[in-house]
Amino acid sequence: MKIRRAFICLPVIIILFFSLLGCRTEKKSEEVSSSARKYRIAVIPKGTTHEFWKAIQAGAIKASRELGVEVFWKGPQKEDDRAQQITVVEDFISRRVDGIVLAPLDDRALVRPVAEAMKEGIPVVIIDSNLQGDNYISFVATDNYKGGVMAAHRLAEILGGRGKIFLIRYLEGSASTTFREQGFLETITREYPEIELLVKDQYAGTTTESAYQLTENLLSRYPQVEGIFTPNESSTFGALRALQQHGLAGKVKLVGFDSSAKLIQALAKNEIHGLVLQDPMKMGYLGVKMVVDFLEGRPVEKRIDTGVVMATPDNMNQPGIKALLEPNISPYVR
């Protein structure tokens, strides 16, 4: 009788065993599927033409490969096209990406779309240029005010603490360059009373050509100028071209911001006397990483300073400076 009962119970035990095993296998499969899911992260620059943005893109792609996430890169053609950048942000919100990394080209105009993304549960990391308020998870950027201060000291140094200069601004509403201009202007005004600002309220615009045209006009109006500060890549190259056209490259001292092949050549020839360098690859990398950290529940710093240094004709071949002048973006972008 006992033997008969044992035979009756055995199939039941076997069925229960495999049922439990199946549940455990299914649960494990769900866990693997969840952890293996790729996050989809949009990276939205101010523009897509300057070398600076290519380095940002390279950093973002490097992070995507190391962290196993998918990155979408899309931005406006021109760095003053507020409407297009807003449309790009709204498009990624509608596509329900997992996170957004944004370099806002206007510190006011992008507040609303960023707030919309955050409300929809899409975390936003701001890079390069700040946004009004703090409705984002992290801000990853250069200390732009400090960069402007460094530029002021460098220009004053090569002018011997006296002379007549231009501050050529970039674009109204661009927070990053506004802070650079502010740092430069306040330092010159406060610390160098023998330096006269001939121009301080003229905007170069977003292209090399517009910067060239403005500098051309200013050189014609103020032939006595001895030094110029320009706060980004396009304004620096535009001013350089104008100085070259007038036969003044190297004679009028030029301190600029950011790097490109032509700016490096001019630095080596002493046609540019200083370039304030950021670390755009680091900016792009950390922008993506901060989104992933937030999604994974790890702590995220509200403000991350990616550093700033001054390149001169004398130090440009030092390894640390050279790496920022010519970041190795070729494994990531063409």
Kindly label every feature range from the protein language model.
Residues R24, E30-R37, A175-S176, T187-T189, ...:
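Hinge/cleft segment of the Venus flytrap/periplasmic-binding protein
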Residues F52-E66, G147-A151, A175-I195, S210, ...:
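Short, solvent-exposed amphipathic alpha-helices that sit
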Residues S64-K78, I165-L167, R190-G205:
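Short beta-strand elements in bilobed, periplasmic/extracellular small-molecule ligand-binding domains
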Residues I93, V101-M118, F184, A204-A266:
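Hydrophobic alpha-helical
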